[in-house]
């Protein structure tokens, strides 16, 4: 764990693990909604194939449900966009550290994903701070644990939220 000067650029933030993980979550949510919408669109047509009026009513019900589900998806997307905007707006206020990712745990919220706990020195006090659960071997995962386990990374510590954001691996 080495504290260093925060020379991170906005381009590095936009290419960071943290930023791209959130972008990937948004894409997964959109694809999931499109998949549900596409498959469920077939139901009104399959059920009411003999009546035009029933097809119209089925389509109206389908459309209402997709708006309802889309509202929840939209709230989640806004959450991720807000987190990325927060990072872009405040990254210069965070302390930069070079750490080794060697202590991991399984996330409860993101099943099958892992997060790392890093030990940093902040204002003279040692702290154990968690990253977000970026890493997984699942199909839709952008970052796999093998690429980062026991590797040195540069990250930013947000003392307000007590979070450690992984920016990039050190070569």
Regions found by a protein language model. Name each.
Residues 2-5, 170-171:
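Short, charged juxtamembrane terminal tails flanking transmembrane helices
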Residues 51, 84, 88-96, 123-128, ...:
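Exposed regions on extracellular, virion, or secretory-pathway luminal proteins
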Residues 98, 115-119, 154:
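Beta-strand secondary-structure signal
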Residues 130-171:
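A membrane-cytosol interface segment of integral membrane proteins
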Residues 2, 11-90:
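Alpha-helical transmembrane spans
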Residues 102, 119-121, 167:
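A structural detector for beta-sheet-dominated domains
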Residues 89-112:
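Structural detector for short beta-strands of small beta-barrel domains
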Residues 109-134:
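OB-fold (S1/OB) nucleic-acid-binding surfaces
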């Amino acid at each position: 764990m080495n504290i260093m000067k925060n020379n991170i650029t906005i381009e590095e933030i936009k290419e960071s693990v943290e930023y791209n993980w959130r972008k990937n979550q948004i894409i997964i949510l959109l694809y999931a909604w499109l998949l549900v919408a596409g498959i469920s669109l077939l139901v009104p047509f399959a059920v009411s194939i003999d009546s035009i009026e029933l097809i119209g009513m089925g389509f109206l019900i389908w459309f209402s449900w997709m708006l309802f589900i889309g509202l929840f998806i939209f709230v989640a997307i806004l959450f991720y966009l807000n987190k990325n905007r927060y990072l872009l707006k405040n990254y210069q206020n965070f302390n930069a550290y070079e750490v080794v990712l060697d202590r991991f745990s399984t996330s409860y919220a993101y099943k099958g994903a892992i997060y790392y706990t890093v030990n940093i020195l902040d204002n003279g006090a040692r702290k154990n701070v968690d990253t977000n659960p970026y890493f997984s071997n699942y199909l839709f995962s952008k970052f796999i644990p093998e690429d980062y386990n026991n590797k040195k990374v540069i990250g930013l510590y947000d003392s307000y939220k007590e979070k450690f954001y992984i920016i990039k691996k050190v070569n």
